[in-house]
A protein has these predicted regions:
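Acetyl-CoA-dependent GNAT
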Residues: 2-80, 84, 89, 102, ...
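Conserved GNAT acetyl-CoA-binding A-motif
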Residues: 109-121
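Conserved beta-strand-loop-alpha-helix junction that forms the acyl-donor binding cleft
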Residues: 120-130, 146-153
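Conserved acetyl-CoA-binding loop-helix of GNAT-fold acetyltransferases
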Residues: 88, 94-107, 131, 135
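Helix N-cap/coil-helix junction residues
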Residues: 97, 114-115, 138
Length: 166
């Protein structure tokens, strides 16, 4: 059984580590490396503070009594809430946890009056996440963020988007 538990201090160290790994996963998609380093840990601590002092909620994901990740929900102005960040430990992926977490996050959002839609984002390189979101009824909006690295990296920037090689 998968549950969301409101983030609390007892989860701080492991959540900082997971945020750093989450940044590493994103970096791996973009830069070809996902190794946590001191600067990523520092950024993770800062991010945790921001997530717990803003307009959102941070939950740890508990599956079969094990803490296996986190989900961050942001209640922005207007009627759209955002599932900003979802992270499931690599060893627990492919077991349906993210599917259950999204459903639980949707229930949390529905409990807040006035929200009529939910958005989330994924890198075009993260095909597994995009496939999951589409399977769960999310549709791709027309806005695409593009990015240029100002320093050299060895990652080949080949992306397929909507069946078109970019």
């Amino acid at each position: 059984m998968t549950k969301l538990k409101k983030f609390g201090g007892k989860y701080k160290d492991e959540t900082v580590e997971r945020i750093a790994r989450y940044f590493g996963f994103s970096a791996g998609l973009h830069f070809g490396t996902d190794k946590p380093d001191e600067s990523r840990m520092k950024a993770a601590k800062k991010t945790l503070k921001e997530w717990t002092h803003g307009n959102g909620e941070l939950f740890v994901i508990v599956d079969k009594k094990d803490t296996v990740g986190f989900v961050h929900i942001n209640y922005r102005t207007g009627n759209t809430a955002w599932i900003e960040d979802i992270y499931v430990d690599e060893t627990r992926r492919g077991q349906g946890i993210a599917t259950r977490v999204i459903g639980l996050a949707e229930d949390k959002i529905k409990s807040h009056r006035g929200y009529t839609s939910i958005c989330l984002e994924a890198s075009p390189d993260n095909k597994a996440a995009l496939a999951l979101y589409h399977k769960l009824g999310y549709v791709t909006l027309g806005m695409i963020t593009v990015r240029k690295e100002i320093y050299k990296n060895d990652k080949k920037n080949e992306t397929e988007l909507f069946g078109t090689d970019l």
